[in-house]
Regions:
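Extreme N-terminal leader/targeting segments of oxidoreductases
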Residues: 1-37, 55
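Accessory recognition modules or surfaces
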Residues: 19, 28-38, 69-83
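N-terminal Rossmann-like FAD-binding beta1-loop-alpha1 element of flavoenzymes
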Residues: 37-61
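Short catalytic/ligand-binding loop motif for oxyanion handling, primarily in non-cytosolic enzymes
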Residues: 70-71, 172-175
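Feature captures the FAD/FMN-dependent oxidoreductase FAD-binding
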Residues: 106-172
């Protein structure tokens, strides 16, 4: 697959998330990018994007501030925490095998079961190998000259990618 085909395929896969057609046509020396995409967040959206992009042949790094996957279901462990939508809405539909491997115990699952499902997904598709945990992102900057994102972490590390996907969710900042 040539560079233009890869760029079109990547913009198609992640287009609904953050990329416009204009953004997918960036000019410049993108060879300076360490990854095709840097994803911030390893909740359900971040894991889904990692799975989809990896299966399309793209190099991906996920940065997660916690020490495991699950997003809001990792952080919110208070007694009685549960989803307010049917548990099936948390089920990924991209794999029939995955759907047949998991059976929700109740219509509106509690936090422990949803977190178990997130861990099952991470294990089933070996997602953790591309996730760097305990990495709090402090900034994401786009260099228009070379068409590369630099995502900086609190530790001082920088990660570069042709694309940056913010999968932090609406519950990632306390209020």
């Amino acid at each position: 697959m040539d560079r233009l085909q890869r760029k079109r395929k990547l913009s198609y896969v992640v287009g609904a998330v953050v990329f416009s057609e204009r953004g997918a046509q960036v000019k410049g020396d993108q060879s300076k990018a360490e990854f095709d995409a840097v994803i911030v967040g390893a909740g359900f959206s971040g894991m889904y994007m990692l799975y989809k992009l990896r299966n399309q042949g793209f190099s991906v790094k996920v940065l997660e501030s916690g020490d495991d996957v699950g997003g809001t279901w990792y952080w919110n462990r208070y007694p009685g925490a549960r989803c307010d939508v049917p548990s099936m809405e948390y089920s990924f539909s991209f794999s029939e095998e995955l759907q047949s491997e998991w059976a929700w115990s109740e219509v509106m699952a509690g936090q422990p079961e949803i977190l178990d499902y997130a861990n099952h997904i991470a294990d089933r598709f070996d997602l953790r190998r591309d996730i760097q945990f305990n990495t709090k992102v402090t900034s994401a900057r786009f260099d228009e000259k070379i068409g590369v994102w630099t995502v900086s972490a609190e530790s001082g590390e920088d990660f570069t990618g042709r694309f940056c996907v913010m999968a932090t969710g609406c519950l990632s900042m306390p209020n």
